[in-house]
Amino acid sequence: MAIILGIDPGSRLTGYGVIEQRGRQLNYLGSGCIKVIGTTKEPLTLAEKLRRIHDSVSELITQFKPNEFAIEQVFMAKNPDSALKLGQARGAAIVAAACAELPVAEYSARQIKQSVVGNGGAEKSQVQHMVMALLNLQRCPQEDAADALAVALCHAHSSQNLIKMAGAARKTVRGRLR
């Protein structure tokens, strides 16, 4: 059994999704968004935003007790400043996982969409639909939470494939599968 915490990092909203994997069965445990937005009068500094992401992810780890952690990789944004902030948000979440001694897996947006929808160029609405279908959800989660659940699902699918390959390798005798 694995409990997987998936993270969709962001400098304003960081999505999280937690699933349980028992063999081929996937169960929804929780999802939501970490809001790192201050007020108009008192905006948060970058350091405060990063601390809030780190502390919130640490709390999620304490609450759900995952044994695996997966996060979306940084994509090259048109605005280099946005890509840097996204990378820093990822770093804050990864440090929280590292402090809890969780293995960290990283997936590109294309890998996640391919794994969940079957099309690496899928639209966000398609990802949300498949997340709902795969986890038997009655309501559509927030966009960032759905993306984080997709990260967790991608990791679950990847680990299932690795287990299959490892099992097949053990069954190989002189180049033949049994």
Curated annotation (Swiss-Prot):
One of its GO terms (biological process) is DNA recombination. CDD domains: RuvC. Its main location: cytoplasm. It is an enzyme of class 3 (hydrolase). SUPFAM superfamilies: Ribonuclease H-like (SSF53098). It catalyses: Endonucleolytic cleavage at a junction such as a reciprocal single-stranded crossover between two homologous DNA duplexes (Holliday junction). Its EC number is 3.1.21.10. The RuvA-RuvB-RuvC complex processes Holliday junction (HJ) DNA during genetic recombination and DNA repair. Endonuclease that resolves HJ intermediates. Cleaves cruciform DNA by making single-stranded nicks across the HJ at symmetrical positions within the homologous arms, yielding a 5'-phosphate and a 3'-hydroxyl group; requires a central core of homology in the junction. The consensus cleavage sequence is 5'-(A/T)TT(C/G)-3'. Cleavage occurs on the 3'-side of the TT dinucleotide at the point of strand exchange. Belongs to the RuvC family. This is Crossover junction endodeoxyribonuclease RuvC. It comes from Idiomarina loihiensis (strain ATCC BAA-735 / DSM 15497 / L2-TR).
